[in-house]
Amino acid sequence: MPVACSSLIYVPVGPATRFEFLLDTLRSIERFAESRHRLLLVDDSAEGLGARAKEAMPEIDVLVLREPGSDAAYNVDGGLFVKVARTVRYATTTYSFQALMRLDTDALMCNSGADTRAIELQGSDPRLGMLGSFRTRCDGHNRAADFPKIGNLVRRNEGSPDEELASVMRSLLSEACANGYEYGEHVLGPGSIMSRAACEALSAYPLYGDERFSKASLSEDHLHSIFIRAVGLESGDFACDDLPLGVWSWHLQWSPEELVWRGKSVVHSVRGYGDWGEDEVRAEFRRLAAVPRYS
């Protein structure tokens, strides 16, 4: 019997993750996520970080992709996509959720409401298979202006001299383009949320997670955005205006206090802000979380 929950929030954990930072991220989720959520740590660290986190936080679930002592090689391109696809399939069969949210180890929750808002939006429009920082970033930057550059990378993979990769890319893109895919369109991975319907459609799609994609030089979020189109669904914005994500690819561009004040619920990347390093950024978010008006 699948485990029932409102939202399932999964955290992929790779090698060289600082354990204290991992716990800080997990605890922020437990504080701010919807009360009926479940938290799944996906341990790809080859260092046993999942077992250590489970010991510290018995309420979390752990999926181990690499046991301690395994080869710790890691990339964020096609190889990561194949592992995330495995995670999505596992989650879809193991849990009965309405929304599947991804948070990276350099992300935090700092206000409540992100998962609840996603469930409401996707429930009101079944075509919205994935939400995230899509065409417009939280600060108003036009991300769509960057799509053509990513589109060129997609085309290079489509025309790869590796015929196995080129073949699956052509098959995937043929269906995605028939459903309105724009070359290079993509939702930023951290903070992205897929609907239950999207996860079921992806899990049933024959090419989803195919090992041949491990050779791709596309990021995991580039590939997932193509797959969302291929299964007949769409992506939508979840960061601009009063929407809950405050995410950038690299360091934060707004201070922790401004992000909390603006009502952003998920922030990325907390590795830095201005002159602050990750320790200082995380400490400031913890301070803000302890202030009653931010609770």
Spans of features found by a protein language model:
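Short beta-strand/loop segment that forms part of the nucleotide-sugar
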Residues: 36-46, 65-69
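N-proximal low-complexity "stem/linker" segments adjacent to membrane-targeting elements
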Residues: 1-27
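Conserved catalytic core of nucleotide-sugar-dependent glycosyltransferases
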Residues: 108-212
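Short beta-strand-to-loop acidic/aromatic patch adjacent to the donor-nucleotide binding site
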Residues: 97-108
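Conserved glycosyltransferase catalytic-site signature
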Residues: 80-85, 187-191, 217-225
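Short, acidic, metal-binding catalytic loop of nucleotide-sugar glycosyltransferases
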Residues: 24-36
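Active-site-proximal specificity loops/subdomain of glycosyltransferases
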Residues: 49-98
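C-terminal catalytic/acceptor-binding lobe
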Residues: 201-295
